[in-house]
Amino acid sequence: MSDAYKQAGVDIEAGYEAVARMKKHVLRTARPEVIGGLGSFGGMFDLSALNMKEPVLVSGTDGVGTKLMLAFQMNKHDTIGVDAVAMCVNDIVVQGAEPLYFLDYIACGKSEPARIEAIVKGIADGCEQAGCALIGGETAEMPGMYDETEYDVAGFAVGAVEKADLVTGADIESGDLILGLPSSGVHSNGFSLVRKILLHDHGYTLDSEIPALGKKLGEELLTPTKIYVKTVLQTLKTGKVKGLSHITGGGFYENVPRMLPEGLGAEIDYGSWPVPPIFSFIRETGQLSAKDMFSTFNMGIGMAVVVSSDDAPHVIRQIQETGEDAYIIGRVTDTSGVVIGGAFE
C-alpha cells in the first residue's frame, strides 16, 4: 500500500483485515438467489428465481441517528447493525414486500477491524431476522471527517411483492380497527431528545442503574429495534390486512396517517397496551406532554395494522401464532388527523 496514504490517515491493510473478518457474518445471511460472492463490484440477485408473475420492487434506506453516540460511549458495537437493518426492512414490509437483500454503508474516522466486524455482525444478525441476504456494502475510512472513535451506519433494503398483493391502504374505511404490535423499547428514533433530557439536563449516565427499568440506562437504550418482517409476512397470508404503518420518527402523529386514505384519521386509545417503563421515565424526567411523547416516540408500539372489526380476532390469533403480541389500540375515523384518547397530560 501507499505509505503516503497511510500517513494521511487511511490504512488500507486494516480495511482488508476488516473485510476478511466480516466474511463469515455475510455468508450466514446467504439466500439461494444470490449470485456471486463477497468482493464483486455490485451485489447480484436472481429475481426470476422467485417465480413472481408481476413483481414490484420496494426499496428503503435509513440510518440509526444519534443512537450511535450511545454505542460510542459504551464501546458496544454489535447491536447497532440490527437497528440499521430494522429501520429499512420494517419500512418496506409495510408495503407487503418480502425483504430480499440488504447493503450497508459504514463511514468511520479510523478503520478498526474488530469494531467493523462487530458492526457487520449486527447487520448480519438483523438480516437473518428479516430473512434477507447481505449482498454488499461499503466501508469508508475518512480521517478528518470523523473522530477516530466515531462512525456512521446506513443501510439499503430491497424487497419484492406481487403487484396484486401490494398493501396500499386503499380499502381502509372508517370503523376499521387498528392493532398494535409491541416495540422492544425506544427503537431508533428520538435519541437527541433522550440524550438532552437524561444525560445533559439531569446528569444520568449510561451506567446509571434505573430501578424502574431494572437495568442500567445504557443497556435499555441500546436495545435493538424489533424486526417485524416474519410476523407481518405471515399475517399478510390471511388476506385480511388493509394497512400497515411502521411507527418511527414522528411517532403516531406522523406515521399512522401515512397508511390512511385521504380524509380519514385515527383515534388511539392510550392505556390499551402496556407501555414500557422507559417511556414513563423519559416523560416524568423531562416533564413532557402527551403531544411531545406521541410525536417523538413509538410509546411501546412499533407496528400498526389495520383490519376490519370482523377480521380482528382472526388476525390477532394469527399474529399470536408467530410468537408476537397484538393489541386493539384504536380505530379509523372519518376525520383526518390522529387523536390520542385517554392520554396523560
From Swiss-Prot:
Residue stretches in coiled coil: none
Keyword Ligase assigned: yes
GO biological process, one term: 'de novo' IMP biosynthetic process
GO cellular component: cytosol
Major subcellular location class: cytoplasm
CDD domains tied to this protein: PurM
Domain of life: Bacteria
EC number, UniProt record: 6.3.3.1
Catalyzed chemical reaction(s): 2-formamido-N(1)-(5-O-phospho-beta-D-ribosyl)acetamidine + ATP = 5-amino-1-(5-phospho-beta-D-ribosyl)imidazole + ADP + phosphate + H(+)
Record keywords, A-Z: ATP-binding, Cytoplasm, Ligase, Nucleotide-binding, Purine biosynthesis
Pathway stated in the Swiss-Prot or TrEMBL entry: Purine metabolism; IMP biosynthesis via de novo pathway; 5-amino-1-(5-phospho-D-ribosyl)imidazole from N(2)-formyl-N(1)-(5-phospho-D-ribosyl)glycinamide: step 2/2
Matches recorded under Pfam families: AIRS, AIRS_C
Protein name according to UniProt: Phosphoribosylformylglycinamidine cyclo-ligase
Organism: Halalkalibacterium halodurans (strain ATCC BAA-125 / DSM 18197 / FERM 7344 / JCM 9153 / C-125) (Bacillus halodurans)
